[in-house]
From Swiss-Prot:
Assigned EC number: 3.6.4.13
InterPro entries: DEAD/DEAH_box_helicase_dom, DEAD_box_RNA_helicase, Helicase_ATP-bd, Helicase_C-like, P-loop_NTPase, RNA_helicase_DEAD_Q_motif
Protein name: Probable ATP-dependent RNA helicase MG425 homolog
Catalytic reaction annotation: ATP + H2O = ADP + phosphate + H(+)
Region (Disordered): 429-450
Family from the record: Belongs to the DEAD box helicase family.
GO MF, one example: RNA binding
Pfam families, per database record: DEAD, Helicase_C
Amino acid sequence: MDSTFNELGVSPALIATLKDNNINQPTTIQQLAIPQFLQHQNLIVHSPTGTGKTAVFGIPVIETLLKKPSKGTTQTLVVAPTRELAEQIKTTFINFAKHTHLKVVSLIGGIPIWQQLKQLENQPEIVVGTMGRVMDLLERGVIKFEHLEHLIIDEVDLMLDRGFKRKLFDLLSRIEKFEQIAVYSASYNEETIETAKQITKNGIFLAAPELKQNAPEPDNKLIDQFVCYLFSNRKKQALYSLVSQTRAKSIIVFCDTKKLVDELCIFLRKNDVKTYPLHGDKAQFIRERNLKLFANTTAPIVLVTTDLIGRGIHVEGVDMVVNYSACVNFETYLHRMGRTGRNNHKGSCITFCTSHEKQAFLKLLEQVNDKRISPLRPMRLRLIPLKCKTQPKKGKLSLQSVQKIYVNPRSNGTFKRVPLAGDLFKSRMRQPERDMQKNKLHDSDWQSNM
């Protein structure tokens, strides 16, 4: 399948706008879904990370609304699980509708309601919102969607993970009428598919032939994956050593808790690393500001975050993703890794892994890379002192010396047993002798357990 946007039924004016946004050729899932959407079908779409999911529904929505006379009211409602994703979808719609009369607003938490109500007075054709704020306004009777053409639920699997199943059906019951409903997600399991069928009344399921799996598939060819075995009390210093020596300029560090995000930001800033935090307890204007600063800077920068931006958010040119703790969830690892290696931009994904996390993480990696992995020897971590005046010059040490976490099979099907990242944190400073002895003891313990 190799269609152009013109063959999919997209108008020349919109095609020109897409080219202005560097969208020249439809992806496989766009080729499948856009014609079905334009035929007013209810859809369940599997659009993995990096396949242009927002454009999958954004393009046909704009195309449909431009062909119909304006009703002077909201005609499209898009519901997303997070504020950041809702804002990104809004920005995409604004870019696509740049040369049209269509108006787009967002309804998200963290923004005063009166400001959003004032925007609604302009009768926008497209509203993008989070579940909480949209339901709040519906329950108050402040807004009504009486002439809705399209209802779009984005990242439905994440909504279910966050316990929004009941609210999804409450939303459907409160919207009096809509012509078409479409559900989109980067991954599907049995519960997600069953819920999506109920929501769409057995809508058409669409997935690109090479992507009919239960999880998103980042392009592993563009992402070098590494694992760093270390002790938990060395993680902070290891992170500092990594960001101080790598060539990467744009780094996202994923943490499991909001408290840890704040702790790491304070720690890295004290050691003169330009760092910004991002998590759900931050005020909305701070979240937006930090994400923009991270996305637009050309200087080396670190964004420390929870899984708030692990799904759906696209930041151009991310060089490296760091998992501060080993992921135990297959989809979480893939979504985090998918923040880099986008649009033919090579990236790295590095995971800090302690001894008790090792076995579970290796099994996860076998799923990701579709191959069995032999037990791997732990590395002996050499750390550079904090604020060390004699530390190596930034950019001098590349990641080329680090071996990939997966092992290429020999011709007879067996796998080599190799160390993973012995040279990752090389430094001019020698480790104290007592630490070296301690590491030797721990190394022997790990080795005996393999």
